[in-house]
Amino acid sequence: MERLAFKMKLNKGQKQAYKERHDQLWPELKQLLKDNGVSEYSIFIDEETNTLFAFQKVSGHGGSQDLANNEIVKKWWDFMADIMQVNPDNSPVSIPLEEVFYME
């Protein structure tokens, strides 16, 4: 099991919309993530900077970051693009984070 972490940026004032959309995560997206080895996925927010910190436990390679060509993922990106910083293809601007400590 591999642990992955990355950060994204939420637009100012969009915390509630972000939370509401994720509270109603599409079942087909959730299943896609599970089918591609994502067993745990958490996202935290630093409200001072609107930085989102995501953490995933994955088996296999890459987790959600390898699903960029999937139509369900692309539709989710389009759905989320108005409330967060995105690339030209509407994928979230995502910066991988290096693990510097782990305790089991």
From Swiss-Prot:
Q: Cross-referenced InterPro entries, in alphabetical order?
A: Dimeric_a/b-barrel, L-rhamnose_mutarotase, Rham/fucose_mutarotase
Pfam families, from UniProt?
rhaM
Please name every pair of cysteines joined by a disulfide bond in this record: none
Q: In which pathway does it act?
A: Carbohydrate metabolism; L-rhamnose metabolism
Q: Which top-rank group of organisms is this from?
A: Bacteria
Compartmental location? Cytoplasm
Task: State which Enzyme Commission number(s) the record gives.
Answer: 5.1.3.32
Give the top-level enzyme category. isomerase
Tell me yes or no: is Cytoplasm among this UniProt entry's keywords.
Answer: yes
Q: Which reaction is this enzyme known to catalyze?
A: alpha-L-rhamnose = beta-L-rhamnose
Database matches in Gene3D superfamilies: 3.30.70.100
Q: Mainly localized where?
A: cytoplasm
Keywords (A to Z) from UniProt: Carbohydrate metabolism, Cytoplasm, Isomerase, Rhamnose metabolism
Q: What does this protein do?
A: L-rhamnose mutarotase involved in ulvan degradation. Ulvan is the main polysaccharide component of the Ulvales (green seaweed) cell wall. It is composed of disaccharide building blocks comprising 3-sulfated rhamnose (Rha3S) linked to D-glucuronic acid (GlcA), L-iduronic acid (IduA), or D-xylose (Xyl). L-rhamnose mutarotase catalyzes the anomeric conversion of alpha- to beta-L-rhamnose.
Q: Which family does it belong to?
A: Belongs to the rhamnose mutarotase family.
How is this protein named in the record? L-rhamnose mutarotase
This protein's species is: Formosa agariphila (strain DSM 15362 / KCTC 12365 / LMG 23005 / KMM 3901 / M-2Alg 35-1)
Q: Which gene encodes it?
A: rhaM
